[in-house]
Amino acid sequence: MNRGDYKNQKHPMVWGYRNVWFDFEPSIANLMIPCSLNDLDLMHETFMSCFTTQKKASFPSPTYDGPFSAWARQIQKDQRKLLATLLGEEFFIRHDNPNVRNSSGFIFIHAMLADGFLDEVEELKSHVQNN
């Protein structure tokens, strides 16, 4: 992606998400998507059906050996537990949105404008090249 690639779009966004390779704290996430237990199971089943070569991925994490989807499901469950610790379980029990009330996991997203993303990429690239 280069700055000129999106000149005809008003405000393109780039989404980064917490996954098996990249970890970030809830304070970095500016979008949190609740997932039901059914959502988490469906994601895992879909992955196992569609990405057959990744069923036995050899290195999804230094602390886990198994399918990416099982590790991702656990991460999303852990993120829900972390939010419950930070906000209290009552936050979820009394929440107006049934998706939040019934959540078993959360996907953490860090959304930013494309220019901001490219600023960060350029800063990181400069840092890496100078070290």
Please identify what each model-predicted range represents.
Residues 1-131:
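Metal-dependent de-N-acetylase/amidase catalytic core
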